[in-house]
Amino acid sequence: IMEAHLIPPKDVPEFWYEIKPLIDKALVHGEEDVNADDLLAPIINGKCFLWIVVNDLEIVSICLGEFCEYPRKKSFYINAWATKSGYEYDEVMETFNGSVVNFAKINGCDFIEAKVRKGLAKKLKWNDKHSLVTLTL
């Protein structure tokens, strides 16, 4: 059974060797020229939040995001999202509602947003807005 866990900032260095390649895998598709090492400090200082999905003690997916304050609304913006296999999104998404979605709601977010490739937008059945998908909470 897959389970999602929010990694406390103090524990990130312990898992970094396993998490870093997954973050880089997600970021390689962006235009921002950002890599996992660029995001380590924001994760450790609590600006970004790192979720892992574990299956039988193996990290199979990561989700990295941060809060974005707009004049009238607040979002949880997902910076990086990847599975180790490149598949298993259905199984990972089963953990998403009880973890990332609840986390965003508890923290006063009105929606979740993520910039994704078109294929993932279609698979998630989220609103595709120029590859920026949103989930209203």
Where are these regions (language model features)?
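Conserved catalytic-core motifs of GNAT/GCN5-like acyltransferases
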Residues: K115, D128-L137
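Short amphipathic alpha-helix that is part of the acyltransferase structural core
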Residues: I1-V34
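A residue-level signal for beta-strand positions that form part of recognition/binding surfaces
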Residues: I1, S75, H130
